[in-house]
UniProtKB/Swiss-Prot annotation:
This is Putative uncharacterized protein encoded by LINC00523. It comes from the Eukaryota. The gene is LINC00523. Residues 46-73 are annotated as: Disordered. It comes from Homo sapiens (Human).
Length: 105
């Protein structure tokens, strides 16, 4: 899969929302670059994680992502994170670097 460097915007209620799809713990998540909030939508994974497939229940996805961010990277409340575009990857408050898979609508 190629790494995209452009971005797209989605119009939601008259506001343009820029989304970035990125890989975290071998799963894809969408990031709202304008409000620095994670759009808690689990994407279909290209990887099978050692035969352990998490259910794609939205609540479980939210808890799983939140726990992974806080436990693996020792981050603060994800709603307060600032996402900084750095070339072909993004950096989350200087702590985490995740490859941007593509910009999504």
């Amino acid at each position: 899969m190629g790494i995209g460097t452009g971005h797209t915007s989605m119009n939601k209620g008259g506001k343009d929302v820029t989304l970035l799809e990125l890989s975290v713990e071998k799963r894809r998540w969408r990031i709202n670059m304008e409000t620095s909030k994670i759009i808690l939508e689990k994407m279909q994974s290209d990887d099978v994680l050692d035969g352990n497939r998490e259910r794609s229940n939205e609540r479980e996805g939210r808890d799983s992502l939140s726990e992974k961010l806080k436990s693996k990277q020792n981050l603060k409340d994800e709603e307060k994170l600032r996402y900084i575009k750095t070339g072909k990857s993004i950096q989350v408050e200087g702590t985490v670097r995740a490859k941007a898979l593509r910009w999504v609508q």
